[in-house]
Amino acid sequence: MAHANKNHIESFPPPGKKITIVFVIGGPGSGKGTQCAKIVKQFGFTHLSAGDLLREEAKYDTEQGTMIKNLMNEGKLVSSDLIVKLLFKAMRESGNDKFLVDGFPRNEENRHAYENIIHIEPEFLLFIDCSKEEMERRILNRNQGRDDDNIDTIRRRFDVFQQQTLPVIQYYEKRGKLRKVDGNRQVDEVFEDVKAIFAQLNNQKIHGGQQASGLSRAQMNPLKRWFFDFFCGCFGTKEEARN
């Protein structure tokens, strides 16, 4: 796998292409991964997980892959800059223009690195809000074979989430970019709310595209209006062409 580098950052997105990015945040056991899978299926987003990208990169026998593997084995954090560059590289190579970034930004350092490197404003941050009690119950009940699914480790993960990720959530809330859903319910009930949020995003993009497509006849200067009327008189409007 090629390294994420400056050239990747500079060449994406292509000129004139609109990229849609949504962050998805939730505590351990909140069900955000399940909701991401449903969003991908319903709305055609590409699902990106910082953790998955790091684990994938660590498989390669390269200087960067070895460094990531060693840091992860030692329980140390990988630099935010590297995480962001891996995310951006994955976006560039995906061929899609809509991305769900799962579990990111995890902290304020992640957020700053994203803003400094990528320069694409997220549409919003989707927060799957779930109580500690419900998340704990789900993690203990699931059978994923994870070594860290014991009560003490689970509670430490909750504490880390509270301390590091809540400031990120508050940041986007102040900017009017927080979309929060109640994650304590059944999967399909949660997705009804999630679906409504993404349907609204789709509608905004459709209307935005129509507004950006050109001036109305009344907004044109007289010369442009004359050409517009001449064209429509010769070839008919779109509505006439359909009839």
Curated annotation (Swiss-Prot):
NCBIfam families associated with the record: UMP_CMP_kin_fam
Disulfide bonds: none
Organism field: Oryza sativa subsp. japonica (Rice)
Full protein name: UMP-CMP kinase 1
Cofactor note: Binds 1 Mg(2+) ion per monomer.
Single Gene Ontology MF annotation: CMP kinase activity
Highest taxon in the source lineage: Eukaryota
Region ranges (NMP): 49-78
Top enzyme class: transferase
Family per similarity comment: Belongs to the adenylate kinase family. UMP-CMP kinase subfamily.
Pfam families associated with the record: ADK (PF00406)
Record remark: domains: Consists of three domains, a large central CORE domain and two small peripheral domains, NMPbind and LID, which undergo movements during catalysis. The LID domain closes over the site of phosphoryl transfer upon ATP binding. Assembling and dissambling the active center during each catalytic cycle provides an effective means to prevent ATP hydrolysis.
Catalysis: reaction(s): UMP + ATP = UDP + ADP; CMP + ATP = CDP + ADP; dCMP + ATP = dCDP + ADP
Sites where the protein binds ATP: G29, S30, G31, K32, G33, T34, R142, R185
Cofactors named for this entry: Mg(2+)
Free-text function comment from the UniProt entry: Catalyzes the phosphorylation of pyrimidine nucleoside monophosphates at the expense of ATP. Plays an important role in de novo pyrimidine nucleotide biosynthesis. Has preference for UMP and CMP as phosphate acceptors.
UniProt keyword terms in alphabetical order: ATP-binding, Cytoplasm, Kinase, Nucleotide-binding, Nucleus, Pyrimidine biosynthesis, Transferase
